[in-house]
Protein backbone atom coordinates (compact mmCIF):
# COMPACT_ATOMS: atom_id res chain seq x y z
CA UNK A 1 0.00 0.00 0.00
CA UNK A 2 2.76 2.45 0.95
CA UNK A 3 4.72 1.55 -2.20
CA UNK A 4 1.65 2.08 -4.40
CA UNK A 5 0.99 5.46 -2.83
CA UNK A 6 4.63 6.45 -3.34
CA UNK A 7 4.53 5.39 -6.99
CA UNK A 8 1.40 7.47 -7.58
CA UNK A 9 2.95 10.51 -5.94
CA UNK A 10 6.03 10.17 -8.12
CA UNK A 11 4.24 10.45 -11.48
CA UNK A 12 3.99 14.25 -11.54
CA UNK A 13 7.37 14.71 -9.87
CA UNK A 14 9.14 12.23 -12.15
CA UNK A 15 7.73 13.81 -15.29
CA UNK A 16 8.57 17.29 -13.99
CA UNK A 17 12.20 16.26 -13.60
CA UNK A 18 12.22 14.63 -17.04
CA UNK A 19 10.43 17.15 -19.25
CA UNK A 20 11.96 20.08 -21.06
CA UNK A 21 9.65 22.93 -21.99
CA UNK A 22 9.66 25.06 -25.11
CA UNK A 23 9.06 28.25 -23.12
CA UNK A 24 8.21 29.50 -19.67
CA UNK A 25 4.47 29.75 -20.37
CA UNK A 26 4.33 26.02 -21.05
CA UNK A 27 6.37 25.34 -17.90
CA UNK A 28 3.94 27.39 -15.83
CA UNK A 29 0.90 25.67 -17.36
CA UNK A 30 2.36 22.28 -16.46
CA UNK A 31 3.09 23.08 -12.82
CA UNK A 32 -0.25 24.88 -12.46
CA UNK A 33 -2.45 22.06 -13.75
CA UNK A 34 -0.60 18.73 -13.68
CA UNK A 35 -0.76 18.20 -9.88
CA UNK A 36 -4.56 18.14 -9.91
CA UNK A 37 -4.64 16.19 -13.18
CA UNK A 38 -2.48 13.45 -11.67
CA UNK A 39 -4.49 13.45 -8.43
CA UNK A 40 -7.78 12.95 -10.29
CA UNK A 41 -6.29 10.13 -12.37
CA UNK A 42 -5.16 8.50 -9.15
CA UNK A 43 -8.58 8.96 -7.54
CA UNK A 44 -10.21 7.32 -10.57
CA UNK A 45 -7.88 4.29 -10.27
CA UNK A 46 -5.95 4.74 -13.49
CA UNK A 47 -2.90 2.50 -13.67
CA UNK A 48 0.57 3.99 -13.24
CA UNK A 49 1.19 3.37 -16.94
CA UNK A 50 -2.03 5.19 -17.92
CA UNK A 51 -1.14 8.14 -15.69
CA UNK A 52 2.23 8.51 -17.37
CA UNK A 53 0.62 8.11 -20.79
CA UNK A 54 -2.10 10.75 -20.31
CA UNK A 55 0.13 13.28 -18.57
CA UNK A 56 2.74 12.89 -21.30
CA UNK A 57 0.15 13.50 -24.03
CA UNK A 58 -1.11 16.50 -22.08
CA UNK A 59 2.38 17.98 -21.87
CA UNK A 60 3.32 17.27 -25.48
CA UNK A 61 0.08 17.84 -27.40
CA UNK A 62 -2.19 20.03 -25.24
CA UNK A 63 -0.10 22.49 -23.24
CA UNK A 64 1.47 23.99 -26.41
CA UNK A 65 -2.09 25.02 -27.37
CA UNK A 66 -3.08 26.73 -24.10
CA UNK A 67 -1.54 30.08 -25.02
CA UNK A 68 0.23 32.46 -22.68
CA UNK A 69 0.02 31.69 -18.99
CA UNK A 70 -2.80 33.85 -17.55
CA UNK A 71 -2.00 36.72 -15.22
CA UNK A 72 -4.23 39.47 -13.89
CA UNK A 73 -2.71 42.18 -16.04
CA UNK A 74 -1.37 40.34 -19.08
CA UNK A 75 -3.18 40.18 -22.40
CA UNK A 76 -4.59 36.76 -23.25
CA UNK A 77 -7.32 35.03 -25.21
CA UNK A 78 -10.42 34.71 -23.01
CA UNK A 79 -12.10 31.33 -23.36
CA UNK A 80 -15.77 30.66 -22.59
CA UNK A 81 -14.68 27.38 -21.01
CA UNK A 82 -14.49 28.92 -17.53
CA UNK A 83 -15.76 32.07 -15.87
CA UNK A 84 -12.14 33.18 -15.49
CA UNK A 85 -11.51 32.83 -19.22
CA UNK A 86 -8.94 30.06 -18.77
CA UNK A 87 -8.80 27.54 -21.65
CA UNK A 88 -8.49 24.27 -19.68
CA UNK A 89 -10.86 22.33 -17.40
CA UNK A 90 -10.77 18.89 -15.80
CA UNK A 91 -13.90 16.86 -15.16
CA UNK A 92 -14.56 13.52 -13.50
CA UNK A 93 -17.29 11.00 -14.25
CA UNK A 94 -17.80 9.84 -10.67
CA UNK A 95 -20.03 6.88 -11.50
CA UNK A 96 -17.62 5.26 -13.99
CA UNK A 97 -14.37 6.80 -12.69
CA UNK A 98 -13.50 8.32 -16.07
CA UNK A 99 -11.43 11.49 -16.30
CA UNK A 100 -12.01 14.03 -19.06
CA UNK A 101 -10.40 17.32 -19.86
CA UNK A 102 -11.56 20.06 -22.19
CA UNK A 103 -9.51 22.82 -23.75
CA UNK A 104 -9.81 25.57 -26.32
CA UNK A 105 -6.82 25.29 -28.68
CA UNK A 106 -4.92 28.57 -28.95
CA UNK A 107 -1.86 29.35 -31.07
CA UNK A 108 0.32 32.32 -31.94
CA UNK A 109 -2.17 33.62 -34.52
CA UNK A 110 -5.13 33.57 -32.12
CA UNK A 111 -6.52 37.06 -31.61
CA UNK A 112 -4.25 38.60 -34.25
CA UNK A 113 -5.29 39.85 -37.68
CA UNK A 114 -4.44 36.39 -39.01
CA UNK A 115 -7.08 34.69 -36.85
CA UNK A 116 -8.93 37.33 -34.81
CA UNK A 117 -11.60 34.94 -33.50
CA UNK A 118 -9.55 31.76 -33.04
CA UNK A 119 -11.19 29.90 -35.90
CA UNK A 120 -8.23 27.91 -37.16
CA UNK A 121 -5.97 26.87 -34.26
CA UNK A 122 -8.10 23.79 -33.70
CA UNK A 123 -6.91 22.25 -36.98
CA UNK A 124 -3.28 22.38 -35.86
CA UNK A 125 -4.23 20.88 -32.48
CA UNK A 126 -6.18 18.09 -34.16
CA UNK A 127 -3.23 17.13 -36.32
CA UNK A 128 -1.14 16.50 -33.20
CA UNK A 129 -3.82 14.27 -31.70
CA UNK A 130 -4.49 12.39 -34.94
CA UNK A 131 -0.78 11.62 -35.21
CA UNK A 132 -0.75 10.23 -31.66
CA UNK A 133 -3.73 7.88 -31.83
CA UNK A 134 -5.55 6.16 -34.73
CA UNK A 135 -9.32 6.13 -35.16
CA UNK A 136 -10.08 9.86 -35.03
CA UNK A 137 -12.66 10.70 -37.70
CA UNK A 138 -13.26 14.32 -38.76
CA UNK A 139 -16.28 13.87 -41.03
CA UNK A 140 -18.94 15.25 -38.71
CA UNK A 141 -16.52 17.71 -37.15
CA UNK A 142 -15.73 19.17 -40.57
CA UNK A 143 -19.43 19.43 -41.39
CA UNK A 144 -20.38 21.26 -38.20
CA UNK A 145 -17.26 23.43 -38.34
CA UNK A 146 -18.31 24.65 -41.78
CA UNK A 147 -21.93 25.17 -40.73
CA UNK A 148 -21.38 26.83 -37.35
CA UNK A 149 -18.04 28.67 -37.28
CA UNK A 150 -16.66 31.57 -39.27
CA UNK A 151 -14.85 31.08 -42.54
CA UNK A 152 -11.87 33.28 -43.41
CA UNK A 153 -13.97 35.91 -45.23
CA UNK A 154 -16.53 36.17 -42.42
CA UNK A 155 -13.77 36.45 -39.84
CA UNK A 156 -12.05 39.24 -41.77
CA UNK A 157 -15.34 41.09 -42.25
CA UNK A 158 -16.38 40.97 -38.59
CA UNK A 159 -12.92 42.09 -37.52
CA UNK A 160 -12.63 44.95 -40.03
CA UNK A 161 -16.11 46.25 -39.23
CA UNK A 162 -15.62 45.87 -35.46
CA UNK A 163 -18.89 43.96 -35.19
CA UNK A 164 -17.90 41.70 -32.29
CA UNK A 165 -18.54 43.29 -28.90
CA UNK A 166 -19.58 41.19 -25.89
CA UNK A 167 -20.47 38.05 -27.82
CA UNK A 168 -18.92 34.69 -27.00
CA UNK A 169 -15.71 34.65 -29.02
CA UNK A 170 -14.90 30.99 -28.42
CA UNK A 171 -15.98 29.00 -31.47
CA UNK A 172 -14.69 25.51 -30.81
CA UNK A 173 -13.16 23.35 -28.09
CA UNK A 174 -11.84 19.81 -27.85
CA UNK A 175 -12.31 17.25 -25.08
CA UNK A 176 -10.52 13.98 -24.36
CA UNK A 177 -12.33 11.20 -22.49
CA UNK A 178 -9.58 9.08 -20.97
CA UNK A 179 -10.44 5.39 -21.18
CA UNK A 180 -7.68 3.12 -19.94
CA UNK A 181 -4.51 4.40 -21.58
CA UNK A 182 -6.39 5.67 -24.67
CA UNK A 183 -8.59 8.69 -25.29
CA UNK A 184 -11.84 9.37 -27.15
CA UNK A 185 -12.02 12.80 -28.76
CA UNK A 186 -15.03 15.08 -29.05
CA UNK A 187 -15.65 18.68 -30.01
CA UNK A 188 -17.87 21.50 -28.75
CA UNK A 189 -18.91 24.24 -31.17
CA UNK A 190 -20.35 27.67 -30.31
CA UNK A 191 -22.11 29.45 -33.22
CA UNK A 192 -22.40 32.90 -31.60
CA UNK A 193 -20.08 34.62 -34.07
CA UNK A 194 -21.54 32.74 -37.02
CA UNK A 195 -24.85 34.19 -35.92
CA UNK A 196 -23.42 37.71 -36.10
CA UNK A 197 -21.94 37.04 -39.54
CA UNK A 198 -25.05 35.45 -41.08
CA UNK A 199 -27.87 37.26 -39.29
CA UNK A 200 -29.35 33.91 -38.27
CA UNK A 201 -30.02 33.13 -34.63
CA UNK A 202 -27.91 30.55 -32.80
CA UNK A 203 -31.09 28.47 -32.57
CA UNK A 204 -31.57 28.55 -36.35
CA UNK A 205 -27.96 27.63 -36.98
CA UNK A 206 -27.80 24.72 -34.54
CA UNK A 207 -31.13 23.15 -35.39
CA UNK A 208 -30.73 23.89 -39.10
CA UNK A 209 -27.35 22.15 -39.24
CA UNK A 210 -28.63 19.07 -37.42
CA UNK A 211 -31.79 18.99 -39.54
CA UNK A 212 -29.66 18.85 -42.70
CA UNK A 213 -27.50 16.11 -41.19
CA UNK A 214 -30.57 14.10 -40.16
CA UNK A 215 -31.85 14.16 -43.73
CA UNK A 216 -28.73 12.23 -44.74
CA UNK A 217 -28.38 10.15 -41.57
CA UNK A 218 -31.99 9.17 -40.99
CA UNK A 219 -31.13 7.09 -37.91
CA UNK A 220 -30.99 10.29 -35.80
CA UNK A 221 -34.01 11.97 -37.39
CA UNK A 222 -36.79 10.75 -35.03
CA UNK A 223 -34.89 11.86 -31.92
CA UNK A 224 -34.09 15.22 -33.50
CA UNK A 225 -37.71 15.83 -34.47
CA UNK A 226 -38.91 15.06 -30.94
CA UNK A 227 -36.36 17.49 -29.48
CA UNK A 228 -37.27 20.18 -31.99
CA UNK A 229 -40.96 19.75 -31.19
CA UNK A 230 -40.23 20.13 -27.47
CA UNK A 231 -38.16 23.28 -27.91
CA UNK A 232 -40.75 24.84 -30.21
CA UNK A 233 -43.51 24.12 -27.71
CA UNK A 234 -41.50 25.69 -24.89
CA UNK A 235 -40.63 28.78 -26.87
CA UNK A 236 -44.16 29.68 -27.94
CA UNK A 237 -45.63 29.58 -24.43
CA UNK A 238 -46.05 33.04 -22.82
CA UNK A 239 -43.58 33.51 -19.98
CA UNK A 240 -44.32 34.82 -16.50
CA UNK A 241 -41.84 35.40 -13.70
CA UNK A 242 -43.13 32.43 -11.69
CA UNK A 243 -43.32 30.01 -14.62
CA UNK A 244 -40.80 27.29 -15.36
CA UNK A 245 -41.73 27.61 -19.03
CA UNK A 246 -39.10 30.20 -19.87
CA UNK A 247 -37.83 30.09 -23.47
CA UNK A 248 -35.02 27.65 -24.15
CA UNK A 249 -32.05 28.96 -26.12
CA UNK A 250 -29.44 26.95 -27.99
CA UNK A 251 -25.94 27.50 -26.66
CA UNK A 252 -23.66 24.97 -28.34
CA UNK A 253 -23.42 21.60 -30.07
CA UNK A 254 -21.04 18.68 -29.65
CA UNK A 255 -20.19 15.47 -31.47
CA UNK A 256 -17.74 12.60 -31.13
CA UNK A 257 -14.80 12.52 -33.52
CA UNK A 258 -15.38 8.92 -34.52
CA UNK A 259 -17.07 7.25 -37.48
CA UNK A 260 -20.47 8.83 -38.27
CA UNK A 261 -22.12 5.45 -37.63
CA UNK A 262 -20.96 5.67 -34.00
CA UNK A 263 -20.78 9.41 -33.38
CA UNK A 264 -23.33 11.10 -31.14
CA UNK A 265 -24.67 14.59 -31.67
CA UNK A 266 -25.53 16.58 -28.54
CA UNK A 267 -27.52 19.81 -28.56
CA UNK A 268 -27.08 22.05 -25.51
CA UNK A 269 -29.92 24.27 -24.32
CA UNK A 270 -29.76 27.09 -21.81
CA UNK A 271 -32.52 27.22 -19.17
CA UNK A 272 -32.68 30.53 -17.33
CA UNK A 273 -35.15 29.32 -14.73
CA UNK A 274 -33.28 27.44 -12.01
CA UNK A 275 -35.95 25.37 -10.28
CA UNK A 276 -36.85 21.76 -9.73
CA UNK A 277 -40.00 21.98 -11.92
CA UNK A 278 -37.89 23.47 -14.74
CA UNK A 279 -35.35 20.66 -14.42
CA UNK A 280 -38.13 18.06 -14.38
CA UNK A 281 -39.51 19.56 -17.58
CA UNK A 282 -36.07 19.39 -19.23
CA UNK A 283 -35.66 15.79 -18.09
CA UNK A 284 -39.01 14.56 -19.41
CA UNK A 285 -39.08 16.82 -22.50
CA UNK A 286 -42.31 18.31 -21.26
CA UNK A 287 -43.82 14.88 -20.58
CA UNK A 288 -42.69 13.24 -23.82
CA UNK A 289 -40.43 10.83 -21.92
CA UNK A 290 -42.37 8.77 -19.40
CA UNK A 291 -40.78 5.31 -19.39
CA UNK A 292 -39.56 3.60 -16.22
CA UNK A 293 -35.94 4.64 -16.77
CA UNK A 294 -37.01 8.28 -17.02
CA UNK A 295 -38.96 8.02 -13.76
CA UNK A 296 -36.05 6.37 -11.94
CA UNK A 297 -33.68 9.07 -13.14
CA UNK A 298 -36.15 11.76 -12.13
CA UNK A 299 -36.20 10.47 -8.56
CA UNK A 300 -32.41 10.79 -8.41
CA UNK A 301 -32.58 14.33 -9.80
CA UNK A 302 -34.98 15.25 -7.01
CA UNK A 303 -32.62 13.61 -4.52
CA UNK A 304 -29.63 15.57 -5.83
CA UNK A 305 -31.59 18.81 -5.86
CA UNK A 306 -32.40 18.35 -2.19
CA UNK A 307 -28.89 17.30 -1.18
CA UNK A 308 -27.31 20.24 -2.99
CA UNK A 309 -29.87 22.63 -1.54
CA UNK A 310 -30.14 24.48 -4.84
CA UNK A 311 -31.39 28.05 -4.67
CA UNK A 312 -34.20 28.64 -7.21
CA UNK A 313 -34.60 31.76 -9.29
CA UNK A 314 -34.45 33.31 -12.75
CA UNK A 315 -30.80 33.58 -13.83
CA UNK A 316 -28.85 35.15 -16.67
CA UNK A 317 -25.25 34.79 -17.79
CA UNK A 318 -23.26 37.88 -16.77
CA UNK A 319 -21.37 39.23 -19.77
CA UNK A 320 -17.85 40.01 -18.51
CA UNK A 321 -15.42 37.34 -17.39
CA UNK A 322 -14.34 37.25 -13.77
CA UNK A 323 -10.83 38.59 -13.13
CA UNK A 324 -8.29 36.03 -11.96
CA UNK A 325 -8.50 35.87 -8.20
CA UNK A 326 -12.05 37.21 -7.95
CA UNK A 327 -14.34 35.35 -5.57
CA UNK A 328 -17.65 34.76 -7.38
CA UNK A 329 -20.82 36.35 -6.13
CA UNK A 330 -23.19 34.99 -8.74
CA UNK A 331 -25.30 32.03 -9.70
CA UNK A 332 -25.69 30.98 -13.30
CA UNK A 333 -28.53 29.50 -15.39
CA UNK A 334 -29.17 25.80 -15.75
CA UNK A 335 -28.38 23.82 -18.86
CA UNK A 336 -29.26 20.51 -20.47
CA UNK A 337 -27.97 18.58 -23.42
CA UNK A 338 -29.79 16.02 -25.53
CA UNK A 339 -27.98 13.15 -27.21
CA UNK A 340 -29.31 11.97 -30.56
CA UNK A 341 -28.48 8.27 -30.63
CA UNK A 342 -28.68 6.31 -33.85
CA UNK A 343 -31.92 4.31 -34.14
CA UNK A 344 -33.35 5.64 -30.89
CA UNK A 345 -36.49 7.77 -31.37
CA UNK A 346 -36.15 9.55 -28.02
CA UNK A 347 -33.40 12.08 -27.20
CA UNK A 348 -31.39 11.23 -24.11
CA UNK A 349 -31.23 14.16 -21.64
CA UNK A 350 -28.39 15.21 -19.43
CA UNK A 351 -29.15 17.97 -16.95
CA UNK A 352 -26.68 20.31 -15.28
CA UNK A 353 -26.78 21.58 -11.71
CA UNK A 354 -24.98 24.93 -11.87
CA UNK A 355 -23.13 25.03 -8.55
CA UNK A 356 -20.49 27.66 -9.38
CA UNK A 357 -20.60 30.24 -6.60
CA UNK A 358 -21.93 27.75 -4.03
CA UNK A 359 -19.85 26.64 -1.04
CA UNK A 360 -17.54 23.87 -2.25
CA UNK A 361 -17.44 22.00 1.05
CA UNK A 362 -21.23 21.83 1.12
CA UNK A 363 -21.28 20.63 -2.49
CA UNK A 364 -18.61 18.03 -1.70
CA UNK A 365 -20.51 16.76 1.33
CA UNK A 366 -23.73 16.52 -0.69
CA UNK A 367 -21.99 14.55 -3.43
CA UNK A 368 -20.31 12.24 -0.93
CA UNK A 369 -23.66 11.48 0.65
CA UNK A 370 -25.13 10.75 -2.79
CA UNK A 371 -22.21 8.44 -3.60
CA UNK A 372 -22.68 6.54 -0.35
CA UNK A 373 -26.42 6.14 -0.85
CA UNK A 374 -25.85 4.62 -4.27
CA UNK A 375 -22.95 2.41 -3.19
CA UNK A 376 -20.21 4.25 -5.03
CA UNK A 377 -18.13 3.55 -1.96
CA UNK A 378 -14.70 4.01 -3.54
CA UNK A 379 -15.55 7.47 -4.86
CA UNK A 380 -17.30 8.36 -1.60
CA UNK A 381 -14.12 7.56 0.33
CA UNK A 382 -11.78 9.48 -2.00
CA UNK A 383 -13.61 12.48 -3.44
CA UNK A 384 -13.18 14.99 -0.64
CA UNK A 385 -9.51 14.11 -0.16
CA UNK A 386 -8.90 14.45 -3.90
CA UNK A 387 -10.07 18.06 -3.93
CA UNK A 388 -8.38 18.96 -0.65
CA UNK A 389 -5.07 17.59 -1.92
CA UNK A 390 -5.51 19.43 -5.21
CA UNK A 391 -5.73 22.73 -3.29
CA UNK A 392 -3.76 21.92 -0.11
CA UNK A 393 -3.03 25.47 1.03
CA UNK A 394 -6.57 26.80 0.99
CA UNK A 395 -9.40 27.00 3.44
CA UNK A 396 -11.58 24.51 1.61
CA UNK A 397 -14.54 25.27 3.87
CA UNK A 398 -14.65 28.81 2.44
CA UNK A 399 -14.09 28.14 -1.28
CA UNK A 400 -16.93 28.61 -3.78
CA UNK A 401 -15.35 28.32 -7.24
CA UNK A 402 -13.93 24.77 -7.48
CA UNK A 403 -17.15 23.12 -8.70
CA UNK A 404 -18.64 24.66 -11.85
CA UNK A 405 -21.30 22.13 -12.88
CA UNK A 406 -22.62 18.75 -11.86
CA UNK A 407 -24.15 16.81 -14.74
CA UNK A 408 -26.58 13.90 -14.41
CA UNK A 409 -27.95 11.37 -16.87
CA UNK A 410 -29.53 7.93 -16.55
CA UNK A 411 -29.43 5.13 -19.08
CA UNK A 412 -29.56 1.35 -19.06
CA UNK A 413 -30.80 1.45 -15.46
CA UNK A 414 -27.68 3.27 -14.32
CA UNK A 415 -27.01 6.86 -13.20
CA UNK A 416 -24.10 8.86 -14.60
CA UNK A 417 -22.80 11.83 -12.64
CA UNK A 418 -19.88 14.08 -13.56
CA UNK A 419 -18.28 17.07 -11.87
CA UNK A 420 -16.59 19.95 -13.72
CA UNK A 421 -13.77 21.49 -11.74
CA UNK A 422 -11.66 24.63 -11.52
CA UNK A 423 -8.26 23.41 -12.74
CA UNK A 424 -5.84 26.30 -12.35
CA UNK A 425 -2.89 26.80 -9.97
CA UNK A 426 -3.27 23.50 -8.15
CA UNK A 427 -1.07 21.47 -5.84
CA UNK A 428 1.66 23.48 -4.15
CA UNK A 429 0.82 26.55 -6.21
CA UNK A 430 -1.27 29.22 -4.42
CA UNK A 431 -4.50 29.65 -6.34
CA UNK A 432 -5.14 33.32 -5.76
CA UNK A 433 -2.00 35.11 -4.59
CA UNK A 434 -1.85 38.71 -3.48
CA UNK A 435 0.53 39.59 -6.30
CA UNK A 436 -0.12 39.62 -10.02
CA UNK A 437 1.00 36.03 -10.46
CA UNK A 438 1.62 33.08 -8.20
CA UNK A 439 5.25 32.02 -7.90
CA UNK A 440 6.42 35.26 -9.48
CA UNK A 441 9.94 34.28 -8.52
CA UNK A 442 9.56 31.18 -10.69
CA UNK A 443 8.73 33.34 -13.68
CA UNK A 444 11.97 35.26 -13.17
CA UNK A 445 14.13 32.29 -12.20
CA UNK A 446 13.53 29.40 -14.59
CA UNK A 447 15.66 27.04 -12.52
CA UNK A 448 13.07 26.71 -9.75
CA UNK A 449 11.18 24.30 -12.00
CA UNK A 450 12.91 22.52 -14.83
From Swiss-Prot:
GO MF term (any one): tryptophan dimethylallyltransferase activity
Biological or metabolic pathway of the protein: Alkaloid biosynthesis; ergot alkaloid biosynthesis
Class of enzymatic activity (EC top level): transferase
Keyword hit for Transferase: yes
One example of a Gene Ontology biological process annotation: ergot alkaloid biosynthetic process
Reaction equation(s) it catalyzes: L-tryptophan + dimethylallyl diphosphate = 4-(3-methylbut-2-enyl)-L-tryptophan + diphosphate
Keywords, comma-separated and alphabetical: Alkaloid metabolism, Transferase
InterPro entries, A to Z: Aro_prenylTrfase, Aro_prenylTrfase_DMATS, DMATS-type_fun, Trp_dimethylallylTrfase
Transferase in keyword set: yes
Annotated residues for binding of substrate: 100, 186, 188, 264, 266, 268, 350, 352, 416, 420
Documented EC number(s): 2.5.1.34
Entry binding sites for L-tryptophan: 80-81, 89, 190, 251
Pfam (any one): Trp_DMAT
Record function comment: Catalyzes the first step of ergot alkaloid biosynthesis. Ergot alkaloids, which are produced by endophyte fungi, can enhance plant host fitness, but also cause livestock toxicosis to host plants.
Entry's family note: Belongs to the tryptophan dimethylallyltransferase family.
Subunit-structure text: Homodimer.
UniProt name for this protein: Tryptophan dimethylallyltransferase 2
Organism taxonomic ancestry: Eukaryota, Fungi, Dikarya, Ascomycota, Pezizomycotina
Name of encoding gene: dmaW2
